[in-house]
């Protein structure tokens, strides 16, 4: 620490002295990213320099180090040192952070501390030049003579470069300004602006900004192009190929030229301020744009103005140049005005006017083919030309008139052409008086068509004929042309005629007002249908007239007129028309009250409007009881109408009843002179109070839970305005309980007993009201309302069990007591209570059921118990008979007991009391019902010794004791279920149930197998329950069912015997019962045949057996004789040892010459296995899970014995002589071990010991021990 402090003090007192440096560090400049080396060395000295180091640009000392990379600075700083007098600093990949002053410091032995400074300048060359507001190489649009300010930016450079401006390669120094902005990293951003005042000559020139850095000699540039906008020149217009004068029909071409403009201008022709369809062309050399438009000159182009417009975005308002055309054309036509008809001796003024022309037209006149001097002519200038006009007067008495007319012709002419037109003036004269034909018969029926002709002779022009009818003038239109004054007159007449029709309809009941209008309005109405024609010098008008009632007693008039008459010539005839009324009306006589009330006298009026002659009126009611009876009524009115017809009214009086409501009354108007009668109908609307269509009261009986809807059908007129419902006298609105009232409909949904009652409906209308009553009775099944609680009694006590029930209807003896399904005699108190009197005995103890049935729904049931004190009794439960568990596992033993009162359980093993809840045992007691109890013993950590002992369940109470011994066995197969029964069947389902047995020591499932009769397809279904419902079965089919149990260890019981169940047929009958009746006889036939065959075979077997036994007896006697002779008269003894399990079905002991079996043959506890060494050893198969014993090598032998062979025999492989071969071989392969999930019975094993031959296994037959000795 002290040496470091001294070193710092020495270096702190360093003074600058370059005379002692052999190589002093120099200033350096370099581009960022390159490497530099500061060199520093001192002069040689006898004593080496003790210390040397560098100080960085940040003022920090880099430290005393040997040659190599210095710590920090990203490994870019390093010392270079060849000897003690030098220390060079190398920096790689320099950056702006390295810019600054560096100092070399040394400690000289003679001079002391010395130092030398140098500077490192980092150069950043320009990388980018850009315009601040424009993209590089872009085009800048600027208006002519408008200043443009452009700024050029050079970012992040060091040192600042020189920025130059160029326009098309020429340096621009005027209006240039430059500024810079320093940054924290010691770089600069340089800004240079240029102001340009451009004109159209600068268009398209390139402006360049260049940045030049002298230190690096780097130049970078960016460019932009000027787009100078300026307007075009004024347009010039001309007519190409200009003729001396334009004429209508000439092809005219006009051109408009414009020079310059940026952007190029749009040049178009306009006429009447509408742009014309034309196109422009551009001359690239002269920059001239020309638009040419061609068209055919017409008279409309005379003095027309065509305008050329040039415009671009710089122009603002377009520049315009217009030209007017002068076109010569003839008059298209002339127009003549003046009178067409004059009387002889009068004069007419005619005016002739030409249509526009250029130049003006000259008018000339020709009358009846001769030219006349032209009067003074006038001229008018119009839009496209000049109109000429002239007047002339024509006197009929001064001219020669032919065919009653004068021909006047006018002609207009100019240098381009002429036009003429004629005018005819007629000389008029009056015709003769007209004549009417076709109305000789003056009586007609309405609707008839009458052809009438009017003729007028002579006249010029010929007469115009018109038809009129009535006191008013009804015009029948002709076909000749009418003047405007006549047209207006006709229109007014038509409008007034329409008014007449409206008034007639509106005032048909107000005669005085109608006649007022009749006599104050005089109307002429046109009627279509007249046909006019001319034949020779006469006019004819034919009218096809459809006669109607308005023509009755009216005059039909024909008028002849022409221009020569001031008043028309008239001829007329009168018409008489028969017609019925258009309609007949029925109305109540009292217009103030339109209602008809029941029992009140009523009057109806039937009226006919305008008939000729007067109508005869009769009445009819459309009721079945009237039989179309005709009523005449009373005539109350018979008057004349404006059409000279008759109005008739008839009154019918009657008293209406309810049956009249809706009845239609017919009024019939007829007359012998009419072609048909006219009638009308009137429905009677008879008002009466509401009336029920059902008998009162209405009784509705429903079952609880049902729904009903009762429509009471109330009739009344007018409609019922108020419905009021009450239940048991209490009003309610729409809903009460589950009953709903809507108008006359009373309905209920899922009724309850509380909905029963008397419902009253009051229906009211404006005439009166009525009531009706509905008695709603809700039937419900009987319900147990009270039942005695379970009773515990001693033997001999008298016990009363009471049961009360309610139901609708309540019936006598609807309550009964049952026990085990049998009815018991009881005392009844009324309909709702039954009392059962019992003498308490053990036989009477148990569950008692009270059933209440009133015939509605499902009978109600209630249970109670009579519990008679009794000693415990263990109930036989098949699945509790034994228990099983694996070594080290858990077994569960259960017993179920009946006892009254409460029972106490005790478990024992080997007469030793089992303690509760120890590590070996745990006990759980459960009460199932009032008299049934169950105790469960859990046995844990099973050992082989547990298999040799039983556990005992002891149940006791104050009245006695009972017990059950339960063996513990290894896991085995489950026992097959029993009592497989069908609980229900439908058309396509069968429900079955069964009872399980012992489960083999693990959880069991049940596998149900079924198949349809005459079908080989077998179905298997697994379930953990003791019942099953199968669906999707065929209707009316028989099925075979079997069931077995499979436990969790894979052991399975055998299948139960097949049981037949069946689905129902369409009638709901079980087909299995029907088929069993039919198959009873056919089922027994195969059994009878089998019995006969077996009986015959048995006789044959007995005969063979007797013969064979006789033969063997003789052979045995012969053998014994031989042995006696060889052995000195003694028979060799044979001793028997071992164990056999009896199987009556598989073996049978011989009757003769067999020694008696020892007691070991009856033991079922021990089996003897013969080892390969000949030793016998006991086997405990229950300790293992294997399903069989170890089998040694053996040879199959068959020994002759009884008729039955021995099953599954095993021989030990020992080196002893084999017994002799039998005289015959059995077909049984008795040595094949069968596997049936450990369900086959235990194999037989017998062991016999011969002193000379060793141990032999199998049944003995003395005849085979040594072979045949004879």
From Swiss-Prot:
Residues exposed to the Cytoplasmic side: 1106-1270
Consequence of substituting residue 115 to A: Reduced syg-1 binding
Domain Ig-like positions: 20-120, 126-221, 235-324, 331-426, 431-576, 581-685, 782-866, 872-965
Reported phenotype of the disruption mutant: Animals are viable, fertile, egg-laying proficient and coordinated. Abnormal synaptic vesicle clustering in the HSNL motor neuron from larval stage L3 through to adulthood. Reduced accumulation of synaptic vesicle proteins snb-1 and cat-1 in HSNL motor neuron. Defective synapse specificity due to altered distribution of synapses. syg-1 is mis-localized and diffusely distributed on the axon of the HSNL neuron.
Membrane topology: Single-pass type I membrane protein
UniProt keywords, alphabetically: Cell adhesion, Cell membrane, Disulfide bond, Glycoprotein, Immunoglobulin domain, Membrane, Neurogenesis, Repeat, Signal, Synapse, Transmembrane, Transmembrane helix
Positions of the UniProt region annotated as Disordered: 1231-1250
Consequence of substituting residue 53 to A: Reduced syg-1 binding
TM region(s), chain numbering: 1085-1105
Subcellular location: Cell membrane; Synapse
UniProt keyword Ligase, yes or no: no
Range of residues in the leader sequence: 1-19
Record GO terms (molecular function): cell adhesion molecule binding; protein homodimerization activity
Highest taxon in the source lineage: Eukaryota
Gene3D superfamilies per UniProt: Immunoglobulins
Chief localization: membrane
Disulphide bond pairs: 40-104, 152-209, 256-308, 352-410, 454-558, 606-667, 803-850, 895-953
A single GO BP: synaptic target recognition
Glycosylation sites: 27, 149, 185, 223, 251, 311, 391
Topological region Extracellular: 20-1084
Tissue specificity of this protein: Expressed in vulval epithelial cells.
Subunit structure: Interacts with syg-1.
Entry remark concerning the domains of this protein: The first five extracellular Ig-like domains are required for correct localization of syg-1.
Protein name (Swiss-Prot/TrEMBL): Synaptogenesis protein syg-2
Biological source species: Caenorhabditis elegans
